[in-house]
Amino acid sequence: MRVNSRNIAYHELIGLEVRILQYPDPSLVGLKGKVVDETLKTLVIETPSGRRVRIFKFNSILEFMLPDGEAVVIKGSTIIGRPWDRLKMVSR
């Protein structure tokens, strides 16, 4: 299944480019990078300089760049959960 704006909440996020649009820590707003790890409640983003930042999904608004170039804005609360459990939630 290819990732698109309709299924991003159920798709693998590792490897996607991301930008933080809203976050409780204002110093992280605007941070861009690639998702390199994901847990139940967090994402690890690697910036172009190689710095890794762990952020909580809850209370964040994120913009993901899909492989086809489309930008998708999503609330972090919609992607809370273990990656493999979210993948199981896809309707067949």
Swiss-Prot record:
Give the UniProt keywords, A-Z: Cytoplasm, Endonuclease, Hydrolase, Nuclease, tRNA processing
**Keyword Hydrolase among record annotations:** yes
The record ties this protein, via SMART domains, to:
POP4
- Single GO molecular-function term? ribonuclease P activity
The UniProt entry's GO biological process terms, in alphabetical order, are:
tRNA 5'-leader removal
Signal peptide positions on this chain? none
Q: Where in the cell is it found?
A: Cytoplasm
Which EC numbers characterise this protein's activity in its record? Answer: 3.1.26.5
Which catalytic reaction applies to this protein? Answer: Endonucleolytic cleavage of RNA, removing 5'-extranucleotides from tRNA precursor
Pfam families hit by this protein: RNase_P-MRP_p29 (PF01868)
Annotated InterPro entries: RNase_P/MRP_Rpp29_sf (IPR036980), RNP1 (IPR023538), Rof/RNase_P-like (IPR023534), Rpp29/RNP1 (IPR002730)
Give the GO cellular component terms, alphabetically.
cytoplasm; ribonuclease P complex
Its main subcellular localisation, reduced to a broad class, is: cytoplasm
Q: What does this protein do?
A: Part of ribonuclease P, a protein complex that generates mature tRNA molecules by cleaving their 5'-ends.
> What family is this?
Belongs to the eukaryotic/archaeal RNase P protein component 1 family.
The record's subunit annotation is: Consists of a catalytic RNA component and at least 4-5 protein subunits.
Protein name per the record? Ribonuclease P protein component 1
